[in-house]
Amino acid sequence: MSENVFLPTENLVMGAKDDSKPMEYCYNFKWGSTGTADGQFLRPHDVSFDSDGYVYISDRDRNDIQKFSANGTFIMKWGSEGNKAGQFSVPYSIEIDSMDNIYVVDRGNDRIQKFDVNGTFIQQWDRPKNVNETDQEFASPEDMVVDRKTGNMYITDTGNERIVKLDSNFSYILEWGSDDGNPSNARGKFNHPHGIDVDSKGYVYVNELENPRIQKFDENGKFIMQWGSEGKGPGQFTPLLEHLEIDSNQDRIFMVDGALNPRIQVFNSDGNFTTSFGTQGNGDGEFSKPEHVNIDSSGNVYVVDRGNQRMQVFSSC
């Protein structure tokens, strides 16, 4: 990672604050510990929910997916290390569509796998299904999102420094980002695209592991704006930025600020900072190397507290 990061100032919001009254978040409960037994974690990475409120968590070192009730009771698990159908090599992100199909970004195998809610394998893709060119193969994909209004999918194809848009049948629509597979700090380009989500209006938000910013695009990949700079103040980010998630009820953007400044920042859809919560530690409401966040239908915020090998849940207060 380069030591100096240049961000263009045009369309850049530098830690602006929202004047409306912010929603605050307080610790509610937690579960998990270190280990390989049911309900334990080695390196938890992402969390997602199905329509019945069940919670699914990927674990990069266990190479499995665990399913829990909303209060953290273990239900079942599936997966093991390997490259066969239903196996994983560093499973990163989990995305669940409106039909409760579960998509797992199998980063180490450069593919996306699809399952039902019982962990039954359905199919897999290592590239959009309507293209055969080797340069369209995924390279270390890390995150994906399904637009629940259109069914279209967006994937952070990280090794290729691009975003790939697919339809609900996994057919190629378009892509944007790098033209040559190399990283770039220019607007509309990427330096290790990491997290991605879509708001209620169809705008796409992307954060990068090696750039302290969030970029906003329309559904066709047209650059709209960006915000962020390096630092620890409101609206600033530290290097090794983790993943963003959008609360679909109010389009609030939750950004995990990673290992160097473990906190969750919250923004509105214009990039204005509203609040933050969390600090370094292993107590309730504290984080060590948080990686992912998600918001359930009741507004509860689930944080993957990877360094503490646990899930923490926060509620508005």
Located regions from the model:
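Eukaryotic scaffold repeat domains enriched in small/polar residues
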Residues: 6, 16-317
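Sec-dependent, cleavable N-terminal signal peptides
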Residues: 1-3
